[in-house]
């Protein structure tokens, strides 16, 4: 049914302040968003903090989805780190003497190309209800927090420092006053931080610290150097001695520390030493591995060379009750002979493991955090209970189809590609079983074929393209890039070796970006464009491809230095996660002019072609103020105007966290910055133009979602009921007019019916009140399936029932000065809707029922029968 809007204003008094003074984030808070999950694949857990006196209460720290708390052993979780300045967590610690005191170190401790950064240390005195930032804001990544066993004011923080560049605020820090002040106890240099710190459980003056020299660049990773080492202090950190007796000579990579709780004379470490990493290298071929000391680190013996992918999560854990039982992370494995041999059991959980906790009172009780959430075991990690209610999925890309209800397609970090409904017709909402897996690996963009809605183009890492028929289950690999024009292998082995050109090693896979770009042409439904280092075009749905040229600088990354030297085969964790460079990162076409193409790369080139890729013009220099070698992240050609396009660029991979967003009106010949008043340091990820209002822009950043109603002159954060989040992608549904948001840490969020945002303007904001257009509504007879599911059961939110009615109040008014009435086509009063009288944007729901004249008021009010389908009018009246 359709509902029109009508506004009646009585006794108006208008003032005309500037737009910039009026619009605020608070003004938009009346537009609620809903989180639909998913939780079926969960997401990356980086640390655990368990209350030992009550192990049913524990906290889970996520890579980019904040902190979650359970008080019932995982049956249910609540988010407790929602509105801070960051979403990324590296470490968490709970004070065992006073479990109300929590410490959180922000910024992932992994070194991924997708790792997010934080802004220091936070502390809570009320079990996570409120938080205070207590310093070390420029440390960016926190590896571990060690707390004094009796003095709640004493803590040690392992600050890793910037991942993408040098900085000073790194090393081991110490506070004796609860975080009011900090002293740096251990510092090597601007390239080296501290990744781990451990305190002797019997003597808090004895500390072990692992220093870690590492640097990631757009073109590679160097995970070690002379700064890495193992240190010990016996005077609470005042002085330090490097521990080397029995350890190998040479440079180290990452080191993890575990002290045997029942006998602190015994210490285990995992030690990385240089070895070229590629995905086909067996883990046990690496140098170094697991070491043990029986005399508090004075001497060491090599137990085994087992150390799975150390740059990511190299961390041993010795069972607090059994010296012979050692667990290792990244690839979950255990040893029953003090680390001489390891068993890596076939898991029913995710295989990329980050953290493990063993109950000191019962070693059978184990909790594991990995890239797929949390598992709990009661038999020492053999059988697992998977926690199914944590919606912390990390989306890279999102797309929608035109089904009813429409479906949402997306790719996730280390959890493949999935599709699920935007709503269901059941009271339970959107459930885990509503989501269907489309592909494996790391998932990225998934697009529905415009000719056949049962065909989906799915993508995994490094442009791993395939064409999937949802009805038959048939999948055809269509990755471009084979030098002879055939379909390139879709596997992601690193293709570099000494003296062997990258494209010729192994399976001859062409270079492709981690998040390889592709799109289906707006002008021809059978045409696809996709980028490796070359831009490729297919006119037969990906069955064959033609090259439109290598659009990178073609630089040889082996000639590029990291931390002042060129990497070599012995470099620790060489190029982990970046097997190819340079590559294309963004491609798009003008929606009005066939053959007008835009292409951007990870080595900083922005090029345009007006002849479908036959010739290219490098227009990078036209983007004023843009540093060299920036990452071209997203193009957004205008749906309204030919020649207009937007680009979102970021440069954090060069340790630059400024905002770079631009607009062209002439097919890329000239560009104008539209950074406007966007708060500093947000880092642009994606930008979209509204399909109905050319002045309305949506900007997804590493820290927050922003809108502009004047094409980028001014920006305001749209947060409402969402936590602090990274927004990697977004789309506006062309039929339902919903804003669909892909977050890298909390799944998918939806703002239903963005009519109010589309109709906002400086003129509207100057009015005393405004009633916005109302989308069609329908009566849904929801199914109540009454299943006995228990409470460990995630339920994504359905849209609120009824007609969504949005209105704006410039100033607050008295409660009796505002009314909202519903009339039928004959002008008869149907219902009166409860309103809110405070200033700002508001959304209220009409439940599509007649008013019950005998129902009473307040909480006892009962609704009348449903209205008949037809046309209705909403009338907002404001007196003032």
Each predicted region: which residue ranges?
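Bacterial N-terminal signal peptides that target proteins for export
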Residues: 1-7, 677
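Bacterial N-terminal signal peptides
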Residues: 7-17
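Beta-propeller blade termini and top-face loops
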Residues: 21-793, 800-803
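Surface-exposed coil/turn segments at beta-strand junctions on protein surfaces, enriched
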Residues: 250, 262, 640, 798, ...
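Beta-strand-rich binding/interaction modules
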Residues: 466-468, 805-806, 813-832, 871-875
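Glycine-centered tight-turn motifs at strand-turn-strand junctions
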Residues: 627-628, 829-866
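Contiguous beta-strand segments within globular domains
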Residues: 784-817, 823, 843-845
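C-terminal tail/sorting-segment detector
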Residues: 878-880
């Amino acid at each position: 049914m359709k509902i029109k809007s009508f506004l009646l204003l009585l006794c108006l008094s208008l003032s005309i302040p500037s737009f910039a003074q009026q619009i605020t984030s608070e003004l938009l808070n009346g537009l609620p968003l809903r989180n639909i999950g998913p939780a079926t694949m969960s997401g990356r857990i980086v640390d655990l903090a368990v209350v030992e006196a009550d192990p049913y209460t524990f906290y889970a720290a996520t890579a980019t989805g904040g902190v979650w708390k359970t008080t019932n052993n995982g049956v249910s979780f609540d988010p407790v780190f929602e509105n801070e300045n960051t979403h990324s967590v590296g470490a968490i610690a709970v004070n065992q003497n006073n479990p109300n005191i929590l410490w959180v170190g922000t910024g992932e401790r992994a070194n991924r190309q997708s790792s997010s950064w934080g802004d220091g240390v936070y502390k809570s005195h009320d079990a996570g209800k409120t938080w205070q930032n207590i310093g070390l804001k420029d440390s960016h990544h926190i590896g571990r927090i060690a707390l004094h066993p009796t003095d709640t004011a004493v803590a040690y923080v392992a600050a890793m420092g910037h991942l993408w560049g040098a900085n000073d605020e790194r090393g081991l820090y110490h506070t004796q006053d609860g975080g009011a002040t900090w002293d740096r106890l251990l510092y090597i240099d601007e390239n080296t931080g501290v990744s781990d710190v451990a305190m002797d459980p019997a003597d808090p003056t004895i500390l072990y610290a692992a220093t870690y020299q590492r640097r990631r660049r757009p073109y590679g990773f160097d995970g070690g150097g002379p700064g890495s080492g193992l240190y010990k202090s016996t005077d609470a950190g005042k002085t330090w001695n490097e521990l080397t007796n029995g350890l190998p000579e040479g440079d180290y990579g990452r080191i993890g520390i575990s002290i045997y709780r029942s006998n602190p004379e015994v210490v285990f470490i995992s030690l990385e030493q240089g070895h070229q990493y590629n995905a086909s290298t067996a883990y046990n071929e690496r140098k170094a591995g697991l070491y043990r000391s029986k005399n508090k680190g004075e001497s060491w013996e090599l137990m085994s060379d087992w150390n799975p992918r150390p740059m990511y999560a190299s961390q041993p854990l010795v069972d607090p009750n059994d010296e012979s039982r050692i667990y290792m992370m990244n690839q979950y494995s255990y040893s029953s002979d003090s680390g001489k041999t390891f068993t890596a059991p076939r898991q029913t959980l995710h295989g990329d493991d980050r953290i493990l906790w063993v109950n000191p009172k019962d070693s059978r009780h184990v909790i594991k955090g990995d890239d797929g959430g949390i598992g709990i075991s009661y038999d020492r990690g053999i059988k697992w209970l998977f926690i199914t209610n944590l919606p912390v999925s990390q989306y890279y890309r999102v797309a929608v189809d035109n089904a009813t209800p429409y479906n949402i397609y997306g790719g996730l970090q280390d959890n493949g590609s999935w599709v699920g409904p935007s709503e269901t017709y059941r009271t339970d909402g959107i459930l885990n079983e509503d989501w269907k897996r489309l592909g494996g690996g790391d998932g990225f963009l998934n697009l529905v074929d415009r000719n056949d809605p049962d065909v989906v183009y799915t993508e995994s890492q490094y442009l791993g393209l395939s064409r999937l028929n949802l009805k038959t289950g048939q999948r055809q690999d269509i990755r471009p890039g084979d030098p002879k024009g055939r379909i390139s292998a879709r596997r992601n082995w690193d293709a570099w070796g000494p003296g062997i050109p990258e494209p010729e090693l192994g399976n001859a896979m062409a270079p492709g970006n981690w998040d390889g770009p592709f799109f289906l042409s707006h002008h021809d439904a059978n045409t696809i464009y996709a980028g490796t280092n070359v831009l490729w075009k297919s006119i037969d749905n990906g069955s064959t491809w033609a090259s439109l040229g290598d659009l990178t600088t073609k630089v040889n990354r082996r000639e590029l230095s990291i931390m002042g030297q060129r990497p070599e085969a012995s470099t620790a964790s060489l190029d982990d996660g970046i097997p190819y460079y340079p590559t294309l990162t963004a491609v798009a076409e003008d929606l009005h002019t066939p053959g007008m193409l835009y292409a951007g790369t990870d080595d900083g080139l922005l090029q345009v072609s007006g002849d479908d890729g036959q010739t290219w013009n490098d227009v990078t220099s036209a983007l004023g103020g843009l540093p060299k070698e920036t990452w071209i992240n997203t193009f957004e050609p205008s749906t309204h105007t030919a020649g207009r396009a937007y680009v979102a660029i970021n440069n954090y991979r060069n340790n630059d966290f400024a905002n770079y967003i631009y607009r062209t009106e002439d097919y890329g010949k000239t560009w104008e910055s539209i950074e406007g008043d966007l708060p500093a340091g947000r880092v642009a990820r994606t930008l979209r133009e509204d399909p109905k209002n050319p002045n309305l822009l949506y900007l997804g950043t590493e820290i927050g979602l922003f809108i502009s109603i004047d094409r980028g002159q001014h920006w305001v954060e749209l947060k409402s009921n969402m936590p602090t989040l990274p927004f990697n992608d977004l789309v506006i549904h062309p039929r339902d007019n919903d804003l669909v948001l892909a977050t890298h840490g909390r799944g998918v969020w939806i703002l239903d019916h963005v009519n109010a945002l589309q109709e906002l303007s400086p003129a509207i904001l100057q009015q005393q009140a405004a009633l916005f257009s109302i989308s069609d509504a329908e009566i849904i007879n929801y199914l109540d399936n009454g299943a006995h599911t228990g409470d460990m059961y995630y339920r994504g939110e359905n849209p609120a029932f009824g007609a969504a009615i949005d209105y704006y109040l410039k100033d607050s008014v008295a409660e009796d000065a505002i009314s909202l009435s519903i009339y039928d086509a004959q002008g008869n009063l149907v219902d009166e809707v409860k309103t809110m009288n405070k200033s700002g944007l508001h959304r209220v729901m009409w439940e599509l029922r007649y008013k019950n004249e005998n129902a009473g008021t307040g909480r006892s009010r009962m609704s009348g029968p449903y209205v008949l389908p037809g046309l209705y009018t909403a009338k907002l009246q404001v007196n003032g």
